[in-house]
Amino acid sequence: MNIEDLWDQFHQPLKTYISHRVNDQSIVDDLLQIVFMKIQVHLPNLIDEQKIDSWIYRITRNTIIDFYRTKKTSEILPDVLHFNDSAEEENFTKEATVCIRSTIKRLPEKYREALELTDFQGLSQKELSEKLGISYSGAKSRVQRGRGKLKQLLEGCCHIEADRYGNIVDFRILKE
């Protein structure tokens, strides 16, 4: 069986399968392309052509899982939170800045220091590793764990929405 025949036979059913699991149509199309690239690369290694249907759907399922896994890790917090300091700055941004800075103070020292140096003072994670005398991967882990802990604390006390660039677009302190 060649890739063109597989495309003719499977592209519509796979597109439907992916669409039931992913809402964004452009992502559906991207994932479908990735699936067929994987099929093309690994087709010569297929041992039992009788099981090609389940093989193709397994590739599709794993591709969707990989998509959500990478999406989840990239959504923890943006690399840097940006605060608009213009004269017409909205009140919630000021409140959010105060809330986030005070919440960061509740973090363990090593995470607090990592976030203050990277997110507020603008150091790169490489510069952070040099300043603290730790490995680069250690610095990356420390920043990521700090952001995770900060997110947990903030989710318990505040509602914060950020756009895809990390700009705060909505903020409210939750009633206790």
UniProtKB/Swiss-Prot annotation:
InterPro entries: RNA_pol_sigma-70-like, RNA_pol_sigma-70_dom, RNA_pol_sigma-Z, RNA_pol_sigma70_ECF_CS, RNA_pol_sigma70_r2, RNA_pol_sigma70_r4_t2, RNA_pol_sigma_r2, RNA_pol_sigma_r3/r4-like
UniProt cross-references to Pfam families, sorted A to Z: Sigma70_r2, Sigma70_r4_2
Gene: sigZ
Keywords (A to Z) from UniProt: DNA-binding, Sigma factor, Transcription, Transcription regulation
DNA-binding region: 125-144
Domain of life: Bacteria
Protein name in the entry: RNA polymerase sigma factor SigZ
Chain ranges for the short sequence motif Polymerase core binding as given in the UniProt record: 30-43
Organism: Bacillus subtilis (strain 168)
Single biological process term from Gene Ontology: response to stress
